[in-house]
């Protein structure tokens, strides 16, 4: 250990230390090395206000460590309880690296006595909230999945900074499979955690996100291969992961020139449980503060669609989240004149005040077929590594077992090749699309960003506008009316009313357009089709359907569905409309008519196997079947 590192550690081990951080980031700093940081704290109002020194040429350095509370998502205009948790930034003034062996030799190991241990919500109370979310939110079409938190509370007897450092030591010694193991002391509070999940990292212009979902809780005797295989075969667990991959693909589509490239899945094994995970990579030139802003916050700890999830969280968590589901982000200079970024989601994290009051918030992903009491048990398991004395038991590992690897690989057999390809492989420019202008109208679901990436790969020139923006249909060869949450019949809502008016305008002008999911439902109503709420929502469901004579595997995210008893309808003022539908239930999968097409499913989703081809075929139909004398002069809304 260098003398400089020893001096920093001596200051950190003082009875009243200055702000500091000890970070074990094996994927970034290298295995066996910890960052030792001391700095000065500030409270910027917004992420753009984080003060960064100019990038330098030479040795890489770390500049700022920021702690981003959940309520910071209000920056994006999304709903959030304002619990007065500030955005915190540590401007790093001194930094060193030391080995894990040297760190363990220095850290204290004092006994930790927890008093008054309890959850703020009992298992029964939490299960009741899960039931309400399934019935009232997922069941009403507000979204596909939501994460609702509960919080473990306790007091550390005779608390001192050495208690938190001992807690950090225990995690460092025993936790495995984590992305960051850390202690961050701000002066007024201390965060100690073992987060399994990267939020986003950027190095040499390559951005990486790491969606993790699905949970296997180890039994008291430890994991077994049979149970691991059962976990990997569980459709609910797979669906949870596919849904968060879709949501993070939306984010990557916003910040990366060519969108995200999906790698995996893999088994992530930890001390008390295991998860499944993917990685998503993409090239970006955006400022790191802008990247953090655009990725507030991970769907794995909020839900999807994100904007709708924020409204649900605000309704069911009136006390706010503080820093739970926020992030710790480390911004630096890469030594080549550019920025580096590494960040971890603030989960599996204890928030300790200077009196020793401990808060550990955890959550469970609620989907349409969640079992409420099972979700309560899962939330307890997620907290187990921090709550208990962290039993020093060796756990078996199965991530490299041939059967496990084969089971993981099989999850990609029927998903979209497009998102598994790199950007060069995706280019599928079609001569009849090259250079054509497309307007996408976003209805509060950034699946539209993924649609845009697929359209650009086909050679189209894409513009995305929110339904609430001023826009015109003039100058575009095609219009895509996008998906979003909500009841398509509720025209009292401004968004729904807007979609009805816009789609009727497109029909009247006979402009070529494609309607997706919510907009497909609005189109169905405009055409006089019956619309019903589904008894069991399709939220993150892959089905094989007959799409106008072709068997296709497609992904559905819908609570409402149009129905028809016929495969064709002749509609006055419109013409003949072809209907792709379920022959048993009559549920409508897609429509084709003069100058338009629509789909209830999401061709852009990871769950749709041949998404770009399906979109291309439907757009081609809309263009080819546009009447020669169609009006193109009237403006859209």
UniProtKB/Swiss-Prot annotation:
**Active site (record annotation):** 517 (for gatase activity), 602 (for gatase activity), 604 (for gatase activity)
Listed GO biological process terms: L-tryptophan biosynthetic process; phenazine biosynthetic process
Keywords (alphabetical) are:
Antibiotic biosynthesis, Glutamine amidotransferase, Lyase, Transferase, Virulence
**Gene3D superfamilies registered for this protein in UniProt:** 3.40.50.880, Anthranilate synthase
Catalytic class of the enzyme:
lyase
Q: Name one GO molecular function term.
A: transferase activity
Q: Where is this region: Anthranilate synthase component I?
A: 1-434
Q: Which residues form the Glutamine amidotransferase type-1 domain?
A: 437-628
Query: Known Pfam families for this protein?
Result: Chorismate_bind (PF00425), GATase (PF00117)
Which EC numbers characterise this protein's activity in its record? 4.1.3.27
Q: Which InterPro entries match?
A: ADC_synthase, Anth_synth_I-like, Chorismate_C, Class_I_gatase-like, GATASE, TrpG/PapA_dom
The record's catalysed reaction(s) read: chorismate + L-glutamine = anthranilate + pyruvate + L-glutamate + H(+)
Pathways per UniProt: Antibiotic biosynthesis; phenazine biosynthesis
Task performed by this protein: Involved in the biosynthesis of the antibiotic, phenazine, a nitrogen-containing heterocyclic molecule having important roles in virulence, competition and biological control.
**Record's miscellaneous remark:** Component I catalyzes the formation of anthranilate using ammonia rather than glutamine, whereas component II provides glutamine amidotransferase activity.
Q: What is this protein called?
A: Anthranilate synthase, phenazine specific
């Amino acid at each position: 250990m260098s003398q400089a590192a020893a001096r920093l550690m001596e200051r950190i081990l003082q009875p009243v230390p200055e702000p500091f951080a000890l970070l074990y980031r094996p994927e970034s700093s290298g295995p066996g090395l910890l960052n030792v940081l001391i700095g000065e704290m500030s409270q910027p109002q917004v992420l753009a206000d984080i003060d960064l020194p100019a990038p330098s040429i030479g040795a890489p350095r770390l500049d700022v460590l920021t702690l981003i509370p959940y309520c910071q998502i209000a920056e994006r205009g999304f709903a959030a309880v304002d619990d007065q948790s500030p955005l915190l930034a540590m401007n790093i003034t001194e930094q060193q690296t030391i080995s894990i062996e040297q760190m363990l030799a220095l850290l204290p190991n004092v006994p930790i006595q927890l008093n008054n241990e309890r959850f703020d919500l009992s298992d029964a109370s939490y299960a009741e909230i899960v039931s309400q979310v399934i019935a009232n939110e997922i069941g009403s079409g507000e979204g596909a999945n939501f994460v609702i938190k509960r919080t473990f509370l306790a007091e550390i007897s005779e608390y001192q900074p050495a208690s938190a450092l001992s807690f950090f030591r225990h995690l460092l010694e025993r936790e495995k499979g984590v992305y960051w193991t850390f202690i961050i002391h701000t002066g007024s509070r201390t965060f100690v955690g073992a987060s399994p999940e990267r939020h986003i990292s950027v190095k040499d212009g390559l951005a990486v996100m790491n969606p993790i979902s699905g949970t296997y809780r180890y039994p008291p005797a430890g994991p077994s291969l049979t149970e691991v295989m059962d976990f990997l075969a569980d459709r609910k667990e797979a669906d949870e992961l596919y849904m968060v991959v879709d949501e993070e693909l939306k984010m990557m589509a916003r910040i990366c020139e060519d969108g995200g490239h999906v790698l995996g899945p893999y088994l992530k094994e930890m001390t008390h449980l295991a998860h499944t995970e993917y990685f998503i990579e993409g090239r970006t030139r955006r400022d790191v503060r802008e990247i953090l802003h655009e990725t507030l916050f991970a769907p794995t700890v909020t839900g999807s669609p994100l904007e709708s999830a924020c409204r649900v969280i605000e309704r069911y968590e009136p006390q706010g989240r503080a820093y739970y589901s926020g992030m710790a982000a480390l911004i630096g200079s890469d030594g080549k004149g550019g920025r580096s970024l590494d960040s971890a989601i603030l989960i599996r994290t204890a928030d300790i005040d200077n009196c020793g009051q401990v808060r550990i918030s955890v959550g469970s992903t609620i989907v349409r077929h969640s079992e409420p009491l099972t979700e309560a048990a899962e939330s307890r398991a997620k907290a187990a590594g921090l709550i208990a004395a962290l039993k020093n038991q060796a756990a078996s590992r199965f991530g490299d077992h041939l059967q496990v690897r084969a089971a993981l690989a099989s999850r990609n057999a029927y998903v979209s090749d497009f998102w598994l390809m790199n950007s060069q492989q995706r280019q599928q420019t079609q001569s009849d699309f090259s250079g054509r202008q497309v307007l996408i109208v976003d209805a509060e679901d950034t699946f539209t960003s993924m649609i845009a990436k697929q359209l650009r790969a086909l050679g189209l020139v894409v513009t995305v506008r929110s339904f609430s923006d001023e826009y015109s249909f003039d100058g575009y060869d095609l219009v895509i009316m996008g998906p979003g949450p909500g009841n398509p019949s509720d025209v009292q809502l401004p968004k729904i009313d807007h979609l009805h008016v816009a789609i009727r305008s497109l029909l009247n002008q006979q402009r070529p357009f494609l309607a997706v999911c919510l907009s497909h439902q609005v189109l169905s109503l405009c055409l006089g089709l019956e619309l019903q709420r589904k008894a069991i929502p399709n939220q993150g469901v892959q089905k094989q359907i007959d799409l106008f004579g072709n068997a296709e595997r497609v992904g559905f995210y819908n609570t409402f569905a149009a129905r028809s008893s016929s495969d064709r309808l002749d509609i006055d003022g419109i013409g003949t409309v072809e209907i792709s539908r379920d022959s048993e239930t009559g549920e409508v999968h897609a429509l084709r008519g003069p100058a338009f097409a629509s789909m209830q499913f999401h061709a852009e989703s990871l769950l749709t196997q041949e998404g770009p081809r399906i979109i291309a075929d439907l757009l081609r139909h809309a263009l080819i079947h546009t009447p020669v004398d169609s009006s193109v002069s009237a403006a859209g809304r």
